[in-house]
Amino acid sequence: MKGRAHIWVALLLACLPPRFRNLDKDVSSPVCRTDDVYTGDAFYPFKKKKYVLYDVHIGEGFNLQKEVLYRVALAVYYLNQEERTHVHYLVLPPWCYVTHWGRERTNARIKWSIFFNLKALQNVIPVMEYAEYEGQFGPHTDYILSYRHIIGEWPKRGDKKSFQVLKLDKCQVKGYKLKKNLRKNCDHKYSVEYSGKCTNVKGKKMECLEFFFITSHFVSSTLLDIFQYDADSVLIKHGSNILVAFMNELVDANLEDVLPYSEDLINEGDQFVEKNFKSSKNYISCHLRYTDFRKISTYDVSPVGISLLKLLYIMFLRKSTLIFVSTDEKKEVKKVIDSQFPQFKHFFFFYENEKLHTGQVAIVDQWICARSGTFVGNIFSRFSMHIKWERSLIGKGGPDHNLDLCGYSISTNHELRKKYSDVQDAHLDEEALQKLRPLYMRLSQKDRDFLRTICYDFAHYYPQNVSIYRRGERREEGRLM
């Protein structure tokens, strides 16, 4: 009996985190996996695990899918705070098909760790990639759940239920199937397409919940109810239906700053800056979005030529000789540079790497933009927004170093002007203008007005604290004009 007791004590000590073991060295344990430890809970190894899977609407962009992670992660955080007898895992959906990856449809099921450093997120909530989950449980879950916002007036009824439970097809879940003519002992009767048609996930039960405000807190409360019964895993279909969290919610949960880029991709961007800019901080970066934005009249995208001329003006204004361009139309932009600005061609730089995945190239682009002295983006673009988010986290979030190119009709379109926090119709700087004089003289009045107008995004959309996970330095910021 004593021998068994000693074995139990040995196992207990092996599983406890280092601060409980009082050991000088963190000896790897044969019992507890070091990559499977929830650092926020000392007694994690002894708790039963529950799993929250999710996905988004098929084809959603890379940066929107990144945003949805924060919403679901916040729900899982609330779960672990509310219910401490179990530990709840966030299962990250694989990347299979993303709209902006074009024809690069793949069944490779790319992991999040290819793009991001997950250690920061794992400090807040337990996280695992879907590949690991599938390895343990197969493509199965106990519950398939989706949410739908109530549109219109809440129906009058005698009872006071907080939400309505509907059939899953009422949530417009595509690829949903109910298997018929099954054997009696078949548990997983329901099947849905999962994560950009990566695979099909089968579930035992399914529900669609309808409510006014699908917040992360509401989601956590419904998950808590489900997990209290005989359920160990839930798949949330269309996690993008969850409302965006308030910044203070993310800050309070330590989730404001949990998706740093992969170290490999950061190093790739750093090497590009070192090679081309000699590590100069005074380069201009920009994001020019054209492909689909041209079709949306309210975005009022300016022509490539006048956009590039405005970037040159800002470059000369900032006493720089370097412009890094991130764009979804590199060939078109390069063509315009060659034809309209051959004398300034040596000022423009692009990042290209055929060995990397499209998503990886996009992140390297974002990091190079994040490091720049001044960034010029598009307030309607999530790609630009995530660059500004990253810049805020490395101490470059000041408004005068994060500009918007402005809509093309900004000087006359009053509704468009309301979409910016500030619009300045400034006088042109003569010294900077002198270097562009021949080109400026050929401009129409509309183009001249566009050139001198400076637009600003809303700073309160972005983090106000410098990250402990990201590398960067604060810098003194002055007015642009």
Swiss-Prot record:
Site (Essential for catalytic activity): E390
Subcellular location: Endoplasmic reticulum
Matches recorded under InterPro entries: GDP-Fuc_O-FucTrfase, OFUT2-like
Pfam family, one: O-FucT
One example GO MF annotation: peptide-O-fucosyltransferase activity
EC number from the UniProt entry: 2.4.1.221
Residue numbers binding GDP-beta-L-fucose: G59, E60, G61, F62, N63, H287, L288, R289, D365, R382, F383
Entries under Gene3D superfamilies matching the protein: 3.40.50.11340, 3.40.50.11350
Keywords assigned by UniProt, alphabetized: Carbohydrate metabolism, Endoplasmic reticulum, Fucose metabolism, Signal, Transferase
Enzyme class of the recorded protein, top EC level: transferase
Key word Signal present: yes
Record's signal peptide: 1-22
Predominant location: endoplasmic reticulum
GO biological process per UniProt: fucose metabolic process; protein O-linked fucosylation
Family according to the record: Belongs to the glycosyltransferase 68 family.
Record PANTHER family: GDP-FUCOSE PROTEIN O-FUCOSYLTRANSFERASE 2
Protein name: GDP-fucose protein O-fucosyltransferase 2
Species assigned in the record: Plasmodium vivax (strain Salvador I)
